[in-house]
Amino acid sequence: MPRVKRGVIARARHKKVLNAAKGYRGRRKNVYRIAKQAVMKAGQYAYRDRRQRKRQFRALWIARINAGAREYGLTYSRFINGLKKSAVEVDRKVLADLAVFDKQAFAKFAELAKSGLAAA
């Protein structure tokens, strides 16, 4: 049975981990055992935060819509309820963008929401 030299595979694996740990501070960037743990933890944070990002953006959009709706005497929940009763289907991302950058268009949505609430 021939002799197996394992240097190539081990070096490739170490290189992959150490390249992923570029930019880390201290021994995390150049000691394989520590870098491996740091890279694994970074992966866990990345996985978790990809899901949290969606929640955080939705919360931001809701806060912006709420602030915009209150300028027209509506709360967020009444504003959304009014739009639903008016059969307006605009997502929160677009509404938040309008609330910040296009006040006139948002005002029209606020009027639609008020008319939807009054009709019901």
From Swiss-Prot:
Gene Ontology BP terms: ribosomal large subunit assembly; translation
Q: Which cysteines are joined by disulfide bonds?
A: none
- One Pfam family linked to the record: Ribosomal_L20
CDD domains in the record, alphabetically? Ribosomal_L20 (cd07026)
InterPro entries, sorted: Ribosomal_bL20 (IPR005813), RIBOSOMAL_L20_CS (IPR049946), Ribosomal_protein_bL20_C (IPR035566)
Instruction: Supply the PROSITE patterns for this chain.
Output: RIBOSOMAL_L20
Work out whether the entry's keyword set contains rRNA-binding.
Answer: yes
Give Gene Ontology CC terms.
ribonucleoprotein complex; ribosome
User: Which keywords does this chain's UniProt record carry?
Assistant: Ribonucleoprotein, Ribosomal protein, RNA-binding, rRNA-binding
Per its record, what are the GO molecular function terms?
Answer: rRNA binding; structural constituent of ribosome
**Its job:** Binds directly to 23S ribosomal RNA and is necessary for the in vitro assembly process of the 50S ribosomal subunit. It is not involved in the protein synthesizing functions of that subunit.
NCBIfam families with a match to the protein in the record: rplT_bact
User: Could you say which protein family the record assigns here?
Assistant: Belongs to the bacterial ribosomal protein bL20 family.
| Protein name listed in UniProt | Large ribosomal subunit protein bL20
Q: Which organism is it from?
A: Methylobacillus flagellatus (strain ATCC 51484 / DSM 6875 / VKM B-1610 / KT)
Q: Which gene encodes it?
A: rplT
